[in-house]
């Protein structure tokens, strides 16, 4: 069997996207997130796909890589037809990714795979080493919720210095490009929580185009204000907002060693799967 490998930049054409989606149906697991399915058709997301077609134009595997925050820092993942995983298709796709990253002068190329033994063996065989893990959690939308007295949640109001200080306190200065990216992107909404006019928390929300989910990113509570229930209140409000927007679930990702993991669970968010990130030394 002869295979032809090609690289296509985002946005991908509709026929290719259809082939990729049909291939993903070969698995019971949902690989759409690490493979950036929601970005395949977008012209403003730097990304590309490596495609492995047979001589009969059957797609047997593909990899997808994307730079989600515009800093030349890519993540990538791959999927191969379950009946052909003993071949070297995965390694060929990884080689295509490496070439694509080199052509784009990427400063980083993290591999992201749902945590499972087959994926671990594959990515380790390519010389990658484990870096960190994130748990994807989801919650059902809430039909009713009322913020505690004195708290308000409003769209970002332009007070950039206060927002930057909050995010630096919760993370570090490396988060600032992400903050500005979230503010500038039209497909993201930044909300802030205030207590009697003072900023105490923030989150960025992204609506999945198929109306299935509302993603929470860059969620932060002022460290000085942690432990007072603000984080839980914000998360519950996000579930309410998901209902108001007609979404079927609210979703977020958090590193497995994050101290706030218990807060997410107490707010109704339950684990879906763990994505393991790998890097080359």
Feature map (PLM): residue ranges:
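Flexible, substrate/cofactor-facing loop regions flanked by secondary structure
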Residues: 20-38, 147-217
């Amino acid at each position: 069997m002869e295979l032809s490998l090609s690289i296509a930049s985002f946005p991908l054409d509709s026929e290719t996207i259809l082939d990729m989606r049909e291939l993903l149906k070969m698995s019971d697991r949902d690989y759409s997130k690490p493979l950036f399915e929601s970005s395949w058709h977008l012209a403003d997301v730097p990304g590309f796909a490596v495609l492995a077609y047979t001589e009969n134009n059957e797609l047997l595997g593909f990899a997808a890589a994307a730079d989600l925050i515009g800093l030349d820092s890519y993540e990538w993942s791959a999927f191969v037809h379950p009946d052909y995983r003993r071949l070297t298709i995965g390694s060929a796709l990884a080689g295509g990714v490496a070439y694509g990253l080199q052509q784009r002068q990427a400063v980083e190329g993290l591999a992201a795979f749902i945590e499972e033994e087959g994926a671990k063996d594959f990515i380790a065989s390519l010389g990658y080493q484990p870096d960190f893990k994130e748990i994807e959690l989801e919650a059902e939308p809430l039909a009713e919720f009322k913020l505690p007295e004195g708290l308000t949640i409003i769209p970002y109001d332009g007070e950039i210095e206060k927002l930057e200080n909050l995010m630096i306190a919760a993370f570090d200065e490396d988060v600032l490009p992400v903050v500005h990216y979230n503010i500038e992107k039209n497909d993201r909404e930044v909300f802030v929580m205030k207590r009697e006019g003072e900023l105490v928390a923030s989150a960025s929300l992204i609506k999945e185009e198929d109306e299935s989910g509302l993603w929470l990113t860059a969620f932060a509570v002022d460290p000085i204000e942690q432990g007072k229930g603000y984080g839980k209140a914000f998360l519950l409000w996000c579930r309410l907002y998901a209902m108001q927007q007609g979404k079927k679930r609210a979703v977020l990702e958090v590193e497995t060693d994050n101290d706030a993991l218990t807060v997410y669970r107490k707010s109704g968010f339950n684990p879906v799967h763990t994505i393991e990130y790998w890097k080359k030394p």
